[in-house]
């Protein structure tokens, strides 16, 4: 099996239903974290891992990727690395999405990385584990932080079960949404069908094939799965409870007040707040622990707390623990 991981596939085609109504305007991978699209954090880690090509799949609200890639849907670049796009008129899920870009893959294993997680995983360690394993796929795992559904035997480095389907008694770990797939797995995926990786992995395990894993507990890993978690990651960044390197080269990040944000002298800002470009906080308004997307407006006298005001929206009156 080939060693070098030359292609990265970033999964950006999901609906983001749990994050609605934020994802009514933009796809989940483009939801901003302190102004930076969520998928850009994955792209920055991938670029630092020296891959040679990045492929991104899209589905709903695909034109919003123009915000990050002005050339979309034409080929683009990220930090000098060629970026190709493949639109899915019908959502193909994870394994189906990978099969759908088979013609775009460079020879060798491919890194598959969810585009809607905030993570700083040690990708070179994942690559090394895969090269050593001789497995069809190597999963990046964590000991905690979400559903523990992958049975994993650490002494052998092999996955023994997924979602309890096989009945293994091995300790359970979290699958991070990041893995390395060997080309030998691709023939097991039928073309043109919506299919997740889980049944593909289970079929391989039942056939006696090796699926490997590596536990990567260092660095941040967050699934921004709902509005509460979206607010929480901003609160943690503001307090310093969480640190993550800037995904923008030669740029200070996070920035809490973006260019063009306007705050009336009689308005009050309490706690942490992220103020997007050209947003407006009007006279007598109070904003606390909230996120104002670009072009949003808090009306005079409004009281906004623990809320998100989406792009171009108006917040008036009492706005608490909600999305406008």
Where are these predicted regions, by residue range?
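Extended, small-residue-rich solenoid/repeat segments and analogous flexible loops
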Residues: 206-286
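Glycine-rich hexapeptide-repeat left-handed beta-helix
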Residues: 283-324
